[in-house]
């Protein structure tokens, strides 16, 4: 028999193989190995929201083949609600609730949500290099990581020398001529500086 894979393993079934007899041409199928273990990862385990604020920034990744998100549920709908696509919305009250994400395989993950009266402020800015080297005419987009992901404070970009490097409101740096410029990335009271040369 010569065996070939006809379907890959999923969380519900092992790999399926089909075999063909090289002499008589008869076909046979078999399972190979076992079904996959359900896995999932959340990009955060807890979030803060201001009253009436909503977010779609909570992401589920790392699912095993064949698995998918079945439901998002809230432990207290007066505090926070969530729709089938994972859009989380704070209500009019402050307090805490838990969001449970359930996969079709049955695996679950929990996200803690705290609803507050105050605006959600930026606590840190990461994901940026301190130095950038760009050739004249070349551009690069900055991708700062703002914590918490639900911060309501806008990200702004400024340059110390527009003749050397410009930066747009979307964080696109363009080198204009040889020299050094300081790019400042700011969100609320937090800021990060990087040198472009």
What is each model feature region?
Residues 1, 14-16, 22, 36-197:
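Extracytoplasmic soluble-region selector
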């Amino acid at each position: 028999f010569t065996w070939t894979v006809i379907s890959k393993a999923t969380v519900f079934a092992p790999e399926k193989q089909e075999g063909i007899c090289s002499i008589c041409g008869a076909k046979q199928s078999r399972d190979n190995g076992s079904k996959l273990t359900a896995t999932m990862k959340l990009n955060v385990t807890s979030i803060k929201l201001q009253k009436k604020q909503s977010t779609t920034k909570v992401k589920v990744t790392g699912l095993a083949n064949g698995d998918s998100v079945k439901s998002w549920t809230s432990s207290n709908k007066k505090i926070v609600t969530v729709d089938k696509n994972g859009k989380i919305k704070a209500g009019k009250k402050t307090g805490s609730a838990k969001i449970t994400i359930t996969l079709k395989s049955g695996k679950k993950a929990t996200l803690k949500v705290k609803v507050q009266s105050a605006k959600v402020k930026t606590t840190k800015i990461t994901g940026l290099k301190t130095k950038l080297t760009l050739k004249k005419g070349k551009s690069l987009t900055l991708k700062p990581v703002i914590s918490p992901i639900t911060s309501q404070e806008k990200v702004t970009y400024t340059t110390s020398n527009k003749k050397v490097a410009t930066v747009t409101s979307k964080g696109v740096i363009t080198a204009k001529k040889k020299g050094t410029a300081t790019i400042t990335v700011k969100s609320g009271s937090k800021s990060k500086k990087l040198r472009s040369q």
